Every structure is written in structure tokens, then in C-alpha cells.
């Protein structure tokens, strides 16, 4: 073993500097944070050659006392904390006392500073960590620091610096983050003698967003906020039309500190998931104000990461705030189509699912998707069956129909299915009286329950609510014009033209119905007359084994049938008559290709695939009654505006929009 050497101070300082000062933008970040901590309201940043030759920061903060000028450049010298306890309640940008020491050890640094109580300031000049001089000087209140020839004495680091243009871009990016984080501070970035960025410190976040981005983005924002005991979450999220193919336009600030956090990003993106198309990322600026005791910022040399005491609660708070804001914005856009009176006819005074209770074993499935959705699709999604037959009679339960007469409105062919009877025997015909659900069984002797069950899953029946009648006023001022290309439904209502994508709309209806059934452990399966045997590769079989609970809880009954071979005996009833093998393999491939292993994300994609495969397709001709039925089912959804993949289900044109297109008005 080699001899252990004690490194000299110069070497240790350069090593430490490498952790804190990665590139010129790191210098800008550390120095601007010092200015902010000093209470500056105007901060100017000047750079040359991407900051490699010169970085100059001028602020009007409190300044540094003459007696502290030398101490400011010592390692671990700081005015932010006094003891270890202070680390757990940090309210400043900096606290370690490493920045000035690290910067001055790898550059030529000049600092001038004056406090208001002194008539003169102090100037200090340091090269490579060695003080060259310290003298009195005349200067304004505040601090001016110049950093030149960065890494001049560290050739290895200098060799790996990026181009001046790249470093300039990185500095511009970090200055823009400061502008967003501190709308009350005026920032001015000067590059090669020319003004590059300028903010005015108005205190208005929207002004800052417009300064950093552009007018289009600032005019397409949705405000959100949520305030709780120890935390406040607020900010702006962009509408779908300003989404991007990358996450560059996403900013997270925790107690005004710009950080990167995968779980916060995931919370926002999951809240936006059903409103965006695939491979698109939302614009957002999110602020999290939280008591310092509940976070730890001392987890990364550059303080770019934080840890939260309770990430689960944080995730939920952020998710709920963003999701509610987006839903509110979409509802406002389609107020005339989905007006409150029409929705209340279906949703107010509670549905029977909330009114009637049944002692039913619940299957707990860990899924966190739009949990507030009020699902009532193809018929009421009743999760609590009544014990009172008279109540069933009062709400208009029809006599039980045989399965031959149960006509699935959206399925071109009658489903070839078998139910199991009380003795679990496969029925050869579908007109007997003792049907029961294929799920965790409920043994009830009330014959009316069977009638309720069949009526509920007869997709041709109307949704069952306390108010049984359809909202007649909904159709009074609505005119169904027809279909365009057997794909888009054209509707006129209140002098507005609505175009509905029939596939996307039906897909969303099926998605919410199936998701609701899974969440409630209420999935109905159909036995296949001929089980489907699928041979899988070893990799595919392993993926199935890892996720077989997802298939089971989604209504699939799958058995292992030899090595890497499976036997599918049951599939979800909602699918109608699918191509079982193609559907199963589609879900399997989605699971394989997904980077996330989050249960909720996997379930979301699996359910979306099921819904997409089962929905009506483009070029399917629909009758007027079928169109009305689809609209009725959309009325029951809490978010009917986008399909599970984020595509819009409908778009709207006002009369004014059309007259502008035809140049009738300006």
C-alpha cells in the first residue's frame, strides 16, 4: 500500500472548488445568490466569452463590513448560520461558506463592497487563493465582484470547458430562473457589452414569465394554488397548446430556490397526463413554500436538489392543485355545451351508487388516477346494490332482459359470452335467470339484484340516477348536423359549432368506466368459449410474471400453460369481442417499454390500451340516437374533454371564429 499523504491547503481548495464550481454559470449562480441574500433589488451581470474571461456582478445589497472582507474568502466562513442546528432551518440561498473561497482559488478575483454606515468601502484582490492587496476605495453601497481568467491555474478543468456560446446559454438560463424566482428583483444580463436580458422587478410573476419567454406563453397560462398548514403550492401551468417535446420549459422553486426534482415533475406531469398528447411535456413554473424544518437542501454540492420530510403528502398536494386547475379551465371552455343544468340532471343529488349501500368486499388496488371522477357510463356504474326491492322499483328498474336481447350500442356484433351461475357451471345459452358477476362473489338471494345487474350492464339503457328522465332541455337548443367522414360528429348549440372525435370521446367513456370498475374491485369478466393459448419469449414471460396482478385485477384470467406459455380463459366484459392475443400483447409491450415502474402509471397505460381497442373507430357510421347516447355518457364524466392519451375529444368554433375565417369581421 502506498504512503498516505496530507494534501496542502492549495490542493484541497482546488479540489473543493471542483465540486462547487463546475462551469462559468456556477460562478454566476453562487454570486447572484449572495446578492439576493444581501437584500439586493437591482442586480447586473456582465460576462465576456461565456464567462470564461470575465464575470462581473454588481448589486445594491447591504454590502460587507470592512472587517469581514478577508474572512469572506476563507473556507466555510459564512454569515448565514452559526451552528449545526441552523442547517435544519435554512431560509437563505447560501449557507456553507464555500462559494467565494472556491471561486477565488481558481481565478483572479476582485471585490469592492460598502455598507451604508461607512463613507468608504474596501477592495480586495486575490489570485489563485492568495491575497494580493486589500485597500480602502470609494464605491456605492452594495457589492461589486469581478472574476476573470476562470480556471487559469487548473489546466485540466480549463481544457474541458465548453464553447463560449454554450456557457453563455447556460448563464442566460440560470439568470432566467432567477427572474422567475424573484419577480420583485430587477436583473440585467450584459453579454459582450450588449444587453441580453432585462427584467424590471415589478413583483408580478406573469411579467417575469413574459420577460423570460414570450407573449404567447404568458397568455396561455393556467393559475393554480393550494395552501395548507406547513406548505403552499402555487404557480402557472401552460395550456396544452404550448406544450413541448422536452422539459426545458419547466421550473421548480422550493422556498425561492431553483431545484430539480423528479418526483415534483412527476406530480405535475401525472396531473396533466390525460390532457396532453403522448411525448409532450407541459410548461410550468411551480413554487413550493414550506417550513425549512421540513426540507433538507444540504444534499448536493450545488444545492440543486432537496429532500422532503414527507414526499407522499407533497406529491398529493401538487397533483391535486394542478389537476383541479386544469379541469376548471377546460370546464370553463365548454360551459355552453356541458352547462351546469344538464350535468346536474345526471350528477346532482348524488347517483344511486352513492345513495344505495351494499355490504360488498372491496378489492383494494393501488391506483392514483383522477380519483375525483364521477363515473356513470353506458348505464349507472353502481357499486352499492340495494337490499330494498321497493327502492329498485321506485327508480325504474326494468324487467330483466335475456342476453340475446342485450344489444351493445357500440359493438357491431353481439358479444359471445357466458356468465357463470350460482353453481359456477358454464351456460350453453344466455337466457337463464340465475346470472351472477364473475368477481369476488356476493351471495344475495334477492332476485331483483340480478335484474339490476343486467340492466346496469345493458349498454343500450339510459344512465340510472335519482332523476331518471333525461335532461330534455339539453336537446332543445342542440342540433346534430351529422358526421363528417364518419369520424367527426358535428353539433350546433347556442350559436356555436362543436366537432367531436367519436373515437376519442368513446375511448374516454370506456376508459373512465373501466378504471372505475378496477378501483372499486368491480371488474366483470367474460369466459371465452375457446381459451387462447399464447407462446411468449422468456423476456415477455418474465414481464407477464412481474405484472400478472395488473392483468388479474383488470379482468383477465390467465394460467401458466407450460414453459413460457399462457392460457387466457377470461377477458374483461367491457371489451366486447376483442382480438384477445393482439390486445394482450399490446399491453405486454407497453409494460415492457415503459420506463416508469409506478403502479399507477402502468395501470393507466394498460387501461388506456383496453379503452382504445374497444372504442368505436373512425369511419364507423353512427345513427342520431347513438350520437345522443354518446353525448349523454360524456355528460357523466368529470373530464370529458380529452382522451386518455391527451388528444382533445372535441373542439369548438364560435360564430365570431367562423366570421373571422371568412373575413366578415376583423
Curated annotation (Swiss-Prot):
Listed Pfam families: DNA_mis_repair, HATPase_c_3, MutL_C
UniProt GO MF annotations: ATP binding; ATP hydrolysis activity; ATP-dependent DNA damage sensor activity; mismatched DNA binding
Cysteine disulfide partners in this protein: none
GO biological process: mismatch repair
PROSITE patterns (UniProt xref): DNA_MISMATCH_REPAIR_1
InterPro entries, sorted: DNA_mismatch_repair_CS, DNA_mismatch_repair_MutL, DNA_mismatch_S5_2-like, HATPase_C_sf, MutL/Mlh/PMS, MutL/Mlh/Pms-like, MutL_C, MutL_C_dimsub
Domain of life: Bacteria
Keywords (A to Z) from UniProt: DNA damage, DNA repair
A GO term from the CC aspect: mismatch repair complex
Family named by the database record: Belongs to the DNA mismatch repair MutL/HexB family.
Protein's job: This protein is involved in the repair of mismatches in DNA. It is required for dam-dependent methyl-directed DNA mismatch repair. May act as a 'molecular matchmaker', a protein that promotes the formation of a stable complex between two or more DNA-binding proteins in an ATP-dependent manner without itself being part of a final effector complex.
Protein known as: DNA mismatch repair protein MutL
Organism of this sequence: Clostridium botulinum (strain Kyoto / Type A2)
Lineage summary: Bacteria, Bacillati, Bacillota, Clostridia, Eubacteriales
Amino acid at each position: 500500500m502506498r504512503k498516505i499523504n496530507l494534501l496542502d491547503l492549495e490542493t484541497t481548495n482546488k479540489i473543493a472548488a471542483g465540486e462547487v464550481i463546475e462551469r462559468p454559470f456556477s460562478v454566476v449562480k453562487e454570486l447572484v445568490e449572495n446578492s439576493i441574500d444581501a437584500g439586493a433589488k437591482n442586480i447586473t451581470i456582465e460576462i465576456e466569452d461565456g464567462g470564461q474571461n470575465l464575470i462581473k456582478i454588481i448589486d445594491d445589497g447591504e454590502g460587507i463590513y470592512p472587517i469581514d472582507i478577508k474572512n469572506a474568502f476563507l473556507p466555510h466562513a459564512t454569515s448565514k448560520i452559526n451552528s449545526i442546528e441552523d442547517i435544519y432551518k435554512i431560509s437563505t440561498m447560501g449557507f456553507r461558506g464555500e462559494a467565494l473561497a472556491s471561486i477565488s482559488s481558481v481565478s483572479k478575483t476582485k471585490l469592492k463592497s460598502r455598507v451604508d454606515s461607512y463613507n468608504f468601502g474596501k477592495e480586495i484582490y486575490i489570485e489563485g487563493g492568495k491575497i494580493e492587496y486589500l485597500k480602502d476605495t470609494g464605491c456605492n453601497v452594495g457589492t461589486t465582484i469581478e472574476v476573470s481568467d476562470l480556471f487559469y491555474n487548473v489546466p485540466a478543468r480549463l481544457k474541458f470547458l465548453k464553447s463560449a456560446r454554450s456557457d453563455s446559454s447556460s448563464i442566460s438560463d440560470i439568470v432566467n430562473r432567477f427572474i422567475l424566482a424573484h419577480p420583485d428583483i430587477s436583473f440585467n444580463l450584459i453579454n459582450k457589452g450588449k444587453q441580453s436580458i432585462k427584467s424590471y422587478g415589478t413583483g408580478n410573476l406573469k411579467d417575469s414569465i413574459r420577460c423570460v419567454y414570450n407573449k404567447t406563453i404568458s397568455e396561455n397560462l393556467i393559475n393554480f394554488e393550494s395552501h395548507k398548514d406547513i406548505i403552499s403550492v402555487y404557480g402557472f401551468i401552460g395550456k396544452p397548446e404550448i406544450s413541448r417535446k422536452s422539459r426545458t420549459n419547466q421550473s421548480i422553486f422550493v422556498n425561492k430556490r431553483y431545484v430539480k426534482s423528479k418526483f415534483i415533475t412527476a406530480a405535475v406531469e401525472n396531473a396533466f397526463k390525460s390532457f396532453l398528447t403522448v411525448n409532450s411535456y407541459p410548461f410550468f413554473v411551480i413554487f413550493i413554500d414550506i417550513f425549512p424544518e421540513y426540507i433538507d437542501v444540504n444534499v448536493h454540492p450545488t444545492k440543486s436538489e432537496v429532500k422532503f420530510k414527507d414526499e407522499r403528502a407533497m406529491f398529493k398536494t401538487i397533483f391535486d392543485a394542478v389537476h383541479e386547475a386544469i379541469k376548471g379551465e377546460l370546464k370553463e371552455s365548454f360551459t355552453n355545451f356541458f352547462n351546469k343544468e344538464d350535468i346536474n340532471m345526471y350528477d346532482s343529488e348524488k347517483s344511486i351508487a352513492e345513495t344505495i349501500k351494499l355490504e360488498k368486499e372491496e378489492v383494494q388496488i393501488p391506483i392514483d388516477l383522477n380519483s375525483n371522477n364521477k363515473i356513470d357510463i353506458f348505464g349507472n356504474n353502481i357499486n352499492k346494490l340495494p337490499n330494498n326491492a321497493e327502492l329498485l322499483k321506485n327508480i325504474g328498474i326494468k324487467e330483466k332482459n335475456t342476453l340475446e336481447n342485450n344489444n351493445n350500442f357500440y359493438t357491431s356484433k353481439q358479444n359471445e359470452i357466458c356468465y357463470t351461475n350460482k353453481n359456477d357451471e358454464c351456460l350453453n345459452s344466455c337466457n337463464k335467470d340465475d346470472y351472477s358477476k364473475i368477481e369476488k362473489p356476493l351471495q344475495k338471494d334477492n332476485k331483483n339484484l340480478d335484474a339490476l345487474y343486467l340492466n346496469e350492464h345493458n349498454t343500450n339503457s339510459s344512465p340510472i340516477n335519482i332523476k331518471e328522465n333525461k335532461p330534455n332541455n339539453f336537446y332543445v337548443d342542440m342540433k346534430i348536423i351529422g358526421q363528417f367522414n364518419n369520424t367527426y360528429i358535428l353539433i350546433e348549440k347556442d350559436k356555436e359549432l362543436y366537432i367531436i372525435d367519436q373515437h376519442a370521446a368513446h375511448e374516454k367513456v370506456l376508459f373512465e368506466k373501466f378504471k372505475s370498475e378496477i378501483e372499486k374491485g368491480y371488474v366483470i369478466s367474460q369466459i371465452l368459449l375457446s381459451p387462447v393459448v399464447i407462446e411468449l419469449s422468456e423476456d415477455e414471460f418474465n414481464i407477464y410474471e412481474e405484472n400478472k396482478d395488473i392483468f388479474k385485477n383488470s379482468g383477465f384470467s390467465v394460467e401458466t400453460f407450460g414453459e413460457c406459455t399462457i392460457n387466457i380463459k377470461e377477458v374483461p366484459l367491457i371489451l366486447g369481442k376483442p382480438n384477445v392475443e393482439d390486445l394482450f400483447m399490446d399491453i405486454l409491450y407497453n409494460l415492457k417499454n415503459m420506463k416508469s415502474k409506478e403502479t399507477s402509471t402502468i395501470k393507466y397505460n394498460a387501461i388506456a390500451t383496453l379503452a382504445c381497442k374497444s372504442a368505436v373507430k373512425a369511419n364507423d357510421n353512427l345513427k342520431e340516437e347513438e350520437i345522443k347516447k354518446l353525448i349523454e355518457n360524456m355528460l357523466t364524466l368529470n373530464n370529458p374533454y380529452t382522451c386518455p392519451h391527451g388528444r382533445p375529444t372535441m373542439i369548438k368554433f364560435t360564430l365570431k371564429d367562423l366570421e373571422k375565417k371568412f373575413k366578415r369581421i376583423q
